[in-house]
Every structure is written in C-alpha cells, then in structure tokens.
C-alpha cells in the first residue's frame, strides 16, 4: 500500500512553517493517542502522524522528502554514469573511461549550480483575415513562472541564506568506496539531501515555498508583421521563463491561427475570389467593380468571356511577411444561369437561339457537338 503524503497526514500546506507543523502535530497526536482514542486504527494513525512530524520538523529530512518523496534515491541502478566512479586500481588504462562513455552516455557531471537558460513558452493567437494581412500591435498576457520578488530567487526567507549541506559537506556528491578483485572503486552519487547543490534551505520563503519562483501573468506588447499566415509562428526573444542560477531567459513563440474570409481565399501571398457574370456581360463584355484587400478596382471583361476564365490583378494580394513586395489577386468569373424567367425573357432567348443559327457549332464547342452527332449516327 502506498504511503500517504506527509503534508496531507498533518493537514498542512507544503509552504507551512515549522510552528504550523508543530501545532498540527500536537493536535493530531493528542486526538489519536492510543491511550485516549480507542478506535481500532488509532494506533496506526498515531504512528503515521509521528513519522510525518519527524520528517517535516527536520530541515534536511524535509528538503529530502520534498525532492524525492517516499522514494529512496539510493535504490536502483538509475543515475549510473562513467564519471560516478573513480577506478583507483586502473590508473594504467587511460581508455577505460572512454569505454564507459560509449556504453553509458559519458559526459561530465552537470553542475546543478551552473547557469541554465529558462524554458521556452508557446502561445496561440487567433487573428481575423484582415489582421493577418495588414498586421497589428496588441498586448497579450502570458502565464509563466517568474523570479520571486520576496527572496529574489534564492528560495530562502528574507534575512536568511542557504546553508552548506552537512551530508555532502557542500560538494553535492556522496561517495561510497568498494573493494573489488580489480581494485578500489569509489562510487559518487548526487547527494539526495541537497539535490547536488551542496546547499539546503533552512528557512523557506513563505511567498514561493522555497522554489524561488512564483506563477504570474506577464503583459507583453507584440507587433505582428503584415502578411503572417495561418500556422506560422513569431519568436519574441527573452520573453520565456527566467533563467536558472543567473542563466538567460527563454523565448516566447506565438503560433497564429487565421480565421477564414467569407469572400477571399489565400494561397501564400496570392488572393483568389470568384465574381458572378450574367449571360449578357459574358457575351457582350463589360467593365465591373471588383473588391480587393486594398479597395475596389475596375476590371474590363472582354466579350465572349467563358465561365472559369481567370484574371490577374497584379500587386493586389498579400504583403510578403519578409518584405518582398505583394502577391497578386486572381479573379475567377462564373457565368450565372438564370433560374426564374418571365415569358418575355424566354421568348427573347428562343429568338436569340434562332438568330444565332449555326454560331454555336463553330469554334471548339461546335466541333465537340459535331463529334457527338456523328458518333450517334455511326459515322467515322
């Protein structure tokens, strides 16, 4: 059966002070003392309360528990590295460490106190079609961890400081020596009590609980470039989480989702749209007004324009996000067939068809109809 959390047993938070822990222990130990409480599980609960207090009332045991929980960091084979061992009896074998490097990953032990870069963050932003095309400036709020202002990132209560770990004497490592038929082997492990830092916090900062960090929402002003597209991302340098031990902060990556437009479609820097034409406009030609992202323009439709014909409006597309000019707008015309005709309109169309004579049988469409007719007659 898994052990219960010590903080849960005493009914205190992980940021509880020594006095709060002591007060909770006295109250619970009195309630569940076997001489007072005659319930069957009282003795077991009393034992559990006592064990929790013994750990949480001791600074180093508490630091060890906060890092590893109930697990024993000295168990198992994890953490084995070539640099964990000092092969005293193999001084003549210069390549022995290389062999361990090959099989176990090698590399020197990372200094836990060395500066490390902060984590990168990702934020998803939704833009309208127009905002993506023309760009915008806006403020966003990012939830992130920041350095605690109370302890300035040390994790220690103001007026106190971290103390040297008495288990590893500030080295961050614990060594065990073993004699083998091949010589003396010294096994060096990360100190489980200080986590390899060589220090521990005796009195924790009550604001951050000893972590040196707090969760906050950071307001950031963002300038979105014109021409950003769906799925693209923008890197904002230095706006990720703060670095560790004086390391540089991480970066913020904003990923954009662009809403579709009801009229325009985008493909890269080019814009596509469809414009309806009547029979008369397509047959006789016309000059129409076409909406673009940059305002309305006049487009000349030549006589005899067929449905599906594409016209290009140069430079009327999306500005390139890297500043390489503008894309184009492609206008595709669709000839609309009327569905509700008056008797007069029907009569006029019949007359038009009669007046057209064999004109429909000329050109590519006419040749197609002739081939169909011959096929049904069996002509070759």
From Swiss-Prot:
Zinc finger (CR-type): 135-217
Protein's cellular compartments: Cytoplasm
Chain positions recorded as Zn(2+) 1 binding sites: 148, 151, 205, 208
UniProt xrefs under PROSITE patterns: DNAJ_1 (PS00636), DNAJ_2 (PS50076), ZF_CR (PS51188)
Domain J: 5-69
UniProt remark on cofactor binding: Binds 2 Zn(2+) ions per monomer.
Residues that coordinate or bind Zn(2+) 2: 165, 168, 191, 194
Primary localization class, coarse: cytoplasm
GO BP annotations listed: chaperone cofactor-dependent protein refolding; DNA replication; protein refolding; response to heat
Domain of life per record: Bacteria
Cofactor: Zn(2+)
Family annotation (InterPro entries): DnaJ (IPR012724), DnaJ_C (IPR002939), DnaJ_domain (IPR001623), DnaJ_domain_CS (IPR018253), HSP40/DnaJ_pept-bd (IPR008971), HSP_DnaJ_Cys-rich_dom (IPR001305), HSP_DnaJ_Cys-rich_dom_sf (IPR036410), J_dom_sf (IPR036869)
Entry's Gene Ontology molecular function annotations: ATP binding; heat shock protein binding; unfolded protein binding; zinc ion binding
Pfam family, one: DnaJ_CXXCXGXG
Family of this protein: Belongs to the DnaJ family.
Subunit structure: Homodimer.
Domains (record comment): The J domain is necessary and sufficient to stimulate DnaK ATPase activity. Zinc center 1 plays an important role in the autonomous, DnaK-independent chaperone activity of DnaJ. Zinc center 2 is essential for interaction with DnaK and for DnaJ activity.
Xref: NCBIfam families: DnaJ_bact, PRK10767.1, PRK14276.1, PRK14280.1
Job of this protein: Participates actively in the response to hyperosmotic and heat shock by preventing the aggregation of stress-denatured proteins and by disaggregating proteins, also in an autonomous, DnaK-independent fashion. Unfolded proteins bind initially to DnaJ; upon interaction with the DnaJ-bound protein, DnaK hydrolyzes its bound ATP, resulting in the formation of a stable complex. GrpE releases ADP from DnaK; ATP binding to DnaK triggers the release of the substrate protein, thus completing the reaction cycle.
Family annotation (HAMAP family): DnaJ
Protein name per its UniProtKB record: Chaperone protein DnaJ
Gene responsible for this protein: dnaJ
């Amino acid at each position: 059966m898994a052990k219960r959390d010590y903080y849960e047993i005493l009914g205190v938070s992980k940021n509880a002070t020594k006095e709060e822990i002591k007060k909770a222990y006295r109250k619970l130990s009195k309630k569940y003392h076997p001489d007072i409480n005659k319930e069957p599980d009282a003795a077991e609960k009393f034992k559990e309360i006592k064990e929790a207090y013994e750990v949480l009332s001791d600074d180093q045991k508490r630091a060890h528990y906060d890092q590893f929980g109930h697990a024993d960091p000295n168990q198992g084979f994890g953490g084995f590295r070539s640099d964990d061992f000092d092969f005293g009896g193999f001084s003549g074998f210069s390549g022995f460490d290389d062999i361990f490097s090959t099989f176990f990953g090698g590399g020197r032990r990372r200094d836990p106190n060395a500066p490390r870069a902060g984590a990168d963050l990702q934020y998803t932003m939704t833009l309208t079609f127009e905002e993506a095309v023309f760009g915008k400036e806006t403020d966003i709020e990012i939830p992130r961890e920041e350095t605690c202002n109370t302890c300035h990132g040390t994790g220690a209560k103001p007026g106190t400081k971290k103390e040297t770990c008495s288990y590893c004497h500030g080295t961050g490592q614990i060594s065990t020596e073993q004699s083998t038929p091949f010589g003396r082997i010294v096994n060096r492990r990360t100190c489980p009590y200080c986590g390899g830092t060589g220090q521990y916090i005796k009195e924790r900062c009550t604001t951050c609980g000893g972590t040196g960090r707090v969760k906050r929402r950071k307001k950031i002003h963002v300038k979105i470039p014109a021409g950003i597209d769906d799925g693209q991302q923008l890197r904002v340098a230095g706006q990720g989480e703060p670095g560790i031990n004086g390391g540089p902060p991480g970066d913020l990556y904003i990923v954009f989702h662009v809403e579709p437009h009801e009229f325009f479609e985008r493909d890269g820097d080019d814009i596509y749209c469809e414009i309806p034409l009547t029979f008369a406009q397509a047959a006789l030609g016309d000059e129409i007004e076409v909406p673009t992202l940059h305002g309305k323009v006049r487009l000349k439709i030549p006589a005899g324009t067929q449905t599906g014909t594409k016209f290009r409006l140069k430079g009327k597309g999306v500005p390139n996000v890297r500043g390489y000019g503008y894309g184009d707008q492609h206008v595709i015309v669709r000839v609309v067939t009327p569905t509700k005709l008056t008797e007069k309109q029907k009569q006029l169309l019949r007359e038009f068809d009669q007046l057209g004579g064999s004109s429909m049988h000329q050109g590519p469409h006419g040749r197609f109809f002739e081939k169909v007719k011959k096929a049904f007659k069996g002509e070759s």
